[in-house]
Curated annotation (Swiss-Prot):
GO molecular function: alpha-1,4-glucan glucosyltransferase (ADP-glucose donor) activity; alpha-1,4-glucan glucosyltransferase (UDP-glucose donor) activity
Gene3D superfamilies named among the record's database cross-references: Glycogen Phosphorylase B
Enzyme class per UniProt: transferase
Binding-site positions, ADP-alpha-D-glucose: K15
NCBIfam families found in the cross-reference section: glgA, PRK00654.1-2
Similarity comment: Belongs to the glycosyltransferase 1 family. Bacterial/plant glycogen synthase subfamily.
The name this protein goes by in its record: Glycogen synthase
Length: 477
């Protein structure tokens, strides 16, 4: 079984979001599972520099100009690169300029990505062609459409990492991207009078996956579907929509081997976690005290992530004796709110604006509770890291959060399945009730330790996801 992942970023070569983490880990897990998985990426500067052994496979003149297809390896995974300097050789973000304006030629930059993905199934590399083209998010959404236009030389899977980003472009660009105008149709890639790369992926793929079972259900509902609910409900009825939970890359996220921690530990040596807490309290300017629960946030500061709820609930958390350590950036109003809280509650609230991968590991290793109060969350990786590190996740019941965290209810504690704290409603009162439950459990150290050990024993490895995808690919054949 030969599978080509078509996408725009891959950790650690280039990362702007969770998609990169998936592509950085899933293909390697699939190779270990017996699938010949390769990755197709635009040759953005950081990616091009990282694939040092790239060799020319093919040269083509396309609707988007001349391209060179390269092939090399990274971390044992075969990587195809679309070398088109006029489209991809730009500093900074792969999607927008330094003023945060989307590049005006994004329609060509990402149509080309989909086109090359489909051409691979028609022999662009004469020595390797995929049985399945697996496209990810709107950037690769045209790959299934180009395959459909070519009579489907390979099966296609389209994975939705976040339905909110739809890849919308003016209709006249149909003249530029070498797809039949008949595809510009409500039964096709047309959406609200424009081309939607996302809808192209959803409509033309043989199968759609979302990054968690709950998110796969949620995106059939109007409040989560951004206008796509009709199509997604139809795909659900046809059995062509399912959820496959993302995994954790255990080579990077494991407290037993994490060199970024002050003290490494396992579920059997959890007492060693205390040194990480002490170091984190010092680093964040918090009072050094192992008796108080340390809550943490590692997140983009947006209302989608529910960080306004944390700000609103913060006085209640602090009144009960807790501390907060926050690492993140985003909405200026939220940034200012958290910085003001740090000034108002010195020793209780520590805030670092920005994102530092290394420091996020130190927070995960040192905190007692990781807050993930998202309004919606397709999968979420932060809570999975929390489970792995015995840093109990406190989450809202939505998307992948609902699939991965079991509340510390009396029933779940008795059944031995409790792994964190879950609240239902997207308001500060509901969040505060969950925080109070965390304090109650904290007052029972042996029970807290029991739940930590439960959480750390859960298996969210990429091997589980790789097996699910392999079964899906074989069903499509």
């Amino acid at each position: 079984m030969q599978v080509l992942h078509v996408c725009s970023e891959m950790f650690p070569l280039l990362k702007t979001g969770g998609l990169a983490d998936v592509i950085g880990a899933l293909p390697a897990a699939q190779i270990a599972d017996g699938v010949d998985a390769r990755v197709l990426l635009p040759a953005f500067p950081d990616i091009r520099r990282g694939v040092t052994d790239a060799q020319v496979v093919s040269r083509r003149d396309t609707f988007a100009g001349h391209i060179t297809l390269l092939f090399g390896h990274y971390n044992g995974v075969g990587i195809y690169l679309i070398d088109a300097p006029h489209l991809y050789d730009r500093p900074g973000s792969p999607y927008h300029d330094t003023n945060l304006f989307a590049y005006t030629d994004n329609v060509l930059r990402f149509a080309l990505l989909g086109w090359v993905g489909a051409e691979m199934a028609s022999g662009l590399d004469p020595f390797w062609r995929p049985d399945v083209v697996h496209a990810h998010d709107w950037h690769a959404g045209l790959a299934p459409a180009y395959l459909a236009a070519r009579g489907r030389p390979a099966k296609s899977v389209f994975t939705v990492h976040n339905l909110a980003y739809q890849g919308m472009f003016y209709a006249h660009h149909m003249n530029d991207i070498q797809l039949p105008w008949s595809f510009f149709n409500i039964h096709g890639l047309e959406f609200n009078g424009q081309i939607s790369f996302l809808k192209a992926g959803l409509y033309y793929a043989d199968h759609i996956t979302a990054v968690s079972p709950t998110y796969a259900r949620e995106i059939t509902e109007p409040q989560f579907a951004y206008g796509m609910e009709g199509l997604l409900q139809q795909r659900h009825r046809e059995g062509r929509l399912s959820g496959v939970l993302n995994g954790v890359d255990e080579k990077i996220w494991s407290p037993e081997t994490d060199l970024l921690l002050a003290s490494r530990y396992t579920r059997d040596t959890l007492e060693d976690k205390a040194k990480n807490k002490r170091q984190l309290q010092i680093a964040m300017g918090l009072k050094v005290d192992d008796k108080v629960p340390l809550f943490a946030v590692v997140s983009r500061l947006t209302s989608q992530k529910g960080l306004d709820l944390v700000l609103e609930a913060l006085p209640g958390l602090l009144e009960q004796g807790g501390q907060l350590a926050l690492l993140g950036a985003g909405d200026p109003v939220l940034q200012e709110g958290f910085l003001a809280a740090a000034a108002e509650y010195p020793g209780q609230v520590g805030v670092q604006i920005g994102y530092h991968e290394a420091f996020s590991h130190r927070i995960m290793g040192g905190a007692d509770v990781i807050l993930v109060p998202s309004r919606f969350e397709p999968c979420g990786l932060t809570q999975l890291y929390g489970l792995k590190y015995g840093t109990l996740p406190l989450v809202r019941r939505t998307g992948g959060l609902a699939d991965t965290v079991s509340d510390c209810s009396l029933e779940n504690l008795a059944d031995g399945v409790a792994s964190g704290f879950v609240f239902e409603d997207s308001n500060a009162w509901s969040l505060l009730r969950a925080i109070r439950r965390a304090f109650v459990l904290w007052s029972r150290p042996s029970l807290w330790r029991f739940v930590q050990r439960q959480a750390m024993a859960m298996d969210f490895s990429w091997q589980v996801a790789a097996k699910s995808y392999r079964e899906l690919y074989y069903r499509l054949k």
